[in-house]
Amino acid sequence: MAMLSEKNNVSDVMFQRLARNNVKKNMRHYLIYFITLLFSVSMLYTFNSIGAQFSMLNMSDRGSYLAFSSGMMASVSVFISLILGFLVVYANKFLMRRRKKELGIYITLGMRQKDISRLLVKETVIIGGLSLIWGILLGIFLSQGLSLITIKFLQIEGAQYRFVISPLAVVECLVFYSLIFFFMNWRNKKMLAKHSLVELLYADKKNEEAPDEKLAGKFFMLTASVICMAASSVISVIDGFNMKYISVSVVVLFIGTFLFFRSVAGILLFLLHKKKRLYYKDLNMFSIHQVSSKINSTNKVLSVICLLLFLSFTTISVGLGISVSVSKGLSKMTSADAVIESYRENSGQEISVKDKLEQLGFPLEKLTSSTVEVDLYEQSDISISSFFLPGTPGKEKLLKDRYKNMDQPLYVMKISAFNDLRRQQGLEPINMDGQEFLINCDVSEISKAYEYYAEHGEAPIEINGHSLSLMKNGVYQMPYQNVNVLSDMGTLIVPDEAAEGLESFRSLLNCMYTENSEQMEEAFMDAWQELNDTGLRIATKRLIITEITSTSMTLSYIAVYLGIIFLICACAVLALQQTANAIDNTARYETLRRLGAKESSMRKTLRTQILVYFGVPLVLGLLYSVVGIRVMYTELGNVPADVIAQNVLFASVMFILVYGSYFFITYNNTKNILKLDRD
């Protein structure tokens, strides 16, 4: 037994040493796999640490909005983990395909499949463990940067940066790695059991085959591809951000991209062949045929990669803009620290909200420095459509898509109540005579229609028997309630006497705390929770801000998260394809070397091939992104040009770092494979 134990220990030491040596020897193969796993783990940590990052914002989570956002991000991470899992498995499959001959040699030397599987497990533990550790460290660093960017862009009051580490995110990364580890080992065992010794030994002799088509057909496909690309751009902007047209646009774009890659290589080969001086210069003939052959054989993959790059750059560029757009509109969504609302038709009460609270024993005077109660009335015969004149810009679009119920009656508010709200918000009251009215609207598209009416409408309107004309510059966008969506499509501000006799169906009590602090918010809400069956509804400023901020920030994170993952997927596939191509071309480069080709010329040839293979999908993807970014930011609306520029710059930096890293790693990797690192 002692001898057997000693033999097993020696075997373990031998396998450990062999695994380390194999990792070192195959580092040029493992490098892309290592970088892909490292980036994957770092992204998982960065975006799963969102719960810890929320703690920097110093926002109350009474409504559990931050917890919901963390859960939403965790759900998205499950989907992302599946994508990354398949990507890592794809990289591992490529690695095993390139090592089949080596594994076949192990079998000829008498090593059992069980021992080979054991060896592969140890290799995976070494390379996976290193990428896991470095990935988590990189994720911790990136999460701090993401926190700083979030605080800067959202400009949340009280937000303060501090260094945080999320133990939960670390655990999630470990779970992801463990699942990938077991799945890869299962795949490796299945691969070894499936292939015979002959298949393993001669696996490196198999190459991809490219379709052969006539030149006229290629010119036709290229023309069709250009038409599809142009049509896609036109379709995407036909009707603003209409998902039906956007979906059609993406499908047409993919078809155009596929036709482009299916045809362009053969056409360029034909055209360059006519340029004899260029074609026969140095190793250009070899380079041109290599690039043409590779693009022809991988046109479907390149089409998908091109769209991934387009989606990646667009989502990263627009992602942070979502939060900025929403944060810019926060001031329009809240009018006071707390707004208590009553629907008279529901509660059946005739007393005011303030009197109702006093009856219930709510300490309103103690908790607030000022209160303003306003009644909203309804004029049944005046609706939004009453102000839509012929020629109103965007009228058809508004009626068709977004605001189909244009016959909805408008709210009516007394000018005295409106001025009380303005004073509470630190604004000057408005002087208006008895024959005028104002319109308050916070929906920008509808507000533009009212402004057009102010310029071109002359006929007065009839309100409760009073003939009123719109006051000059009488369109306002002042909030008078706390809401999570801008929904005031028009409130008529009329002289007090014009509202006399109208039935009040809704009352709002705008409250300002005695001090603007988290403690006062907690005290107010604790007192509110003690009330039972009030028939009233409450919306606090901090609760609304927390809800909107957490939702918009989560959407921004998801957009950037997906964008970076798409980028990693595209880069990894490109890198693996080129590495596989280099291994397949080892004999061809040896032939060039025997024919007297210079090492510098062969390096230039290799660099050109990789540059074209990486560059063409990137250029196309960025061109597509120009249209995509324009459409998205047009829909988002109030995002300043300098913020858009910053977001695009951020996306560009991400592309330079990730895309550039994969490019240089691929070039150095293939250069070592082809032994072109010698002078």
Q: What residues fall within each predicted segment?
A:
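Peri-transmembrane interface segments
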Residues: 24, 28-35, 46-80, 94-97, ...
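N-terminal Sec/SRP start-transfer signal
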Residues: 1-41, 208-224, 228, 262-309, ...
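Selective transmembrane-helix segments that form parts of the transport pathway or gating/packing helices
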Residues: 27, 33, 120-138, 174, ...
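Small-residue-rich transmembrane alpha-helices
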Residues: 42-53, 90-94, 127-156, 169-194, ...
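Membrane-embedded alpha-helical segments of integral membrane proteins
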Residues: 230, 234, 241-278
